[in-house]
Amino acid sequence: MGLLKTEAIVLKNNLIGETDKIATLFTKSYGKLQAVAKGARRSKSRFVNAIRPFIVANYVIFEGKNYYYIDQWELIEAHRNIEKDLVKFSVASYIAETINKILEENQKSERLYLFLKHSLKAVDELQIDPLIFISSYNLKLVSLLGYMPQLDNCVVCGKRENLKYFSNSCGGAVCINCKNKCFDAKPLHEVTLKAIKYFLKGDYDKLQNIKVSGVIKEEVDKIITAYMKEHLEIEFKSKDFIDNLQNM
């Protein structure tokens, strides 16, 4: 394949051998791939900062016998605030984990790449309640993947009135008359539905000063987490750590 030149985001890195590290990169041009940074564990190596989690950089990569290897790199976004803040780092870890688990090796998606880049930049630069941010991110992610929940009309009959329930299996809001047609329909507070709509449609910067009660935040989080599990069939370990932070 020769040399690959691409912008990429580091999803995670691991140790390999005595002096090297291997990174999971989401590249803009070639999708997800694993690339080794030779000598990255040495303090004076030119690759010591090349695969820090969540950075955005331009890479030149070549294909070896067993792995891809990083030949050159140039930093684009360092995301220093994420590095310094435990909550921001935890949110970024969750975001990176979702993308890593969703993508297959070498699977390309420029729309998903740009969404990830935009989301990490928002985590780094904005001050948003972590539970609100993750709920907004999750809603935007499932919608981007083709699983946008129906929120404006009953998912069964299409009526706009009395949307008092939410069903994961049916795919969204359910009216009073149709609640028995979705076996998992659960009561949905009117304010919760409004919050879900706002988190889905509003850009991240609109979430900085929003006032939402703890009860509504938790209800939205539970609904969206269950919805993701239903449609993506994936659970994310780093979400547990964020939940624990919220309870500290």
UniProtKB/Swiss-Prot annotation:
Pfam families (UniProt xref): RecO_C (PF02565), RecO_N (PF11967)
This protein's UniProt keywords: DNA damage, DNA recombination, DNA repair
GO cellular component terms, A-Z: bacterial nucleoid
InterPro entries registered for this protein in UniProt: ARFGAP/RecO, DNA_rep/recomb_RecO_N, NA-bd_OB-fold, RecO, RecO_C
A biological process from GO: DNA recombination
Cysteines joined through disulfide linkages: none
Classification via Gene3D superfamilies: Nucleic acid-binding proteins, Recombination protein O, C-terminal domain
Protein's job: Involved in DNA repair and RecF pathway recombination.
Homology family: Belongs to the RecO family.
Name the UniProt record assigns to this protein: DNA repair protein RecO
Gene giving rise to this polypeptide: recO
